[in-house]
């Protein structure tokens, strides 16, 4: 079972970003590459229980500080204790595992 939290309210996103280890999948329903990434992201959420996995549909959230740098989707961002530590566009499963392993 996936442990991904869908976020659609800016205040909720602000609160969740303060966690120790957070990974966010920014995408959109109309994005083909996002649909390919989604089951991988969901699977990884069950394998890394100490990381908070979030999904944000960029069309359903107001402009947020974290979305200002997004130029392409899917974009994955990693936050540690409220600070962005990494951003990667259209990652594959190997790349995601590597960055998740680096958070340990």
Swiss-Prot record:
Keyword Oxidoreductase in record: no
Disulphide bridges, residue numbers: 31-34
Keywords: Disulfide bond, Electron transport, Redox-active center, Transport
Active site residues of this protein: 31 (nucleophile), 34 (nucleophile)
Domain Thioredoxin: 2-104
Site residues by UniProt (Contributes to redox potential value): 32-33
Tagged with keyword NAD: no
GO MF term (any one): protein disulfide isomerase activity
Pfam family, one: Thioredoxin
Protein task: Participates in various redox reactions through the reversible oxidation of its active center dithiol to a disulfide and catalyzes dithiol-disulfide exchange reactions.
Family membership: Belongs to the thioredoxin family.
Name of this chain's protein: Putative thioredoxin-4
């Amino acid at each position: 079972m996936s442990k991904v939290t869908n976020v659609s309210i800016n205040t909720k996103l602000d609160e969740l970003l303060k966690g120790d280890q957070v990974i966010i999948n920014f995408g959109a329903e109309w994005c083909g590459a996002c649909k390919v990434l989604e089951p991988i992201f969901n699977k990884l959420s069950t394998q890394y229980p100490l990381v908070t996995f979030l999904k944000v549909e960029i069309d359903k959230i107001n402009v947020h500080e974290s979305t200002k740098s997004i130029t392409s989707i899917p974009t994955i961002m990693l936050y540690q204790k409220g600070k962005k530590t990494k951003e990667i566009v259209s990652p594959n499963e190997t790349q995601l595992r590597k960055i998740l392993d680096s958070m340990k």
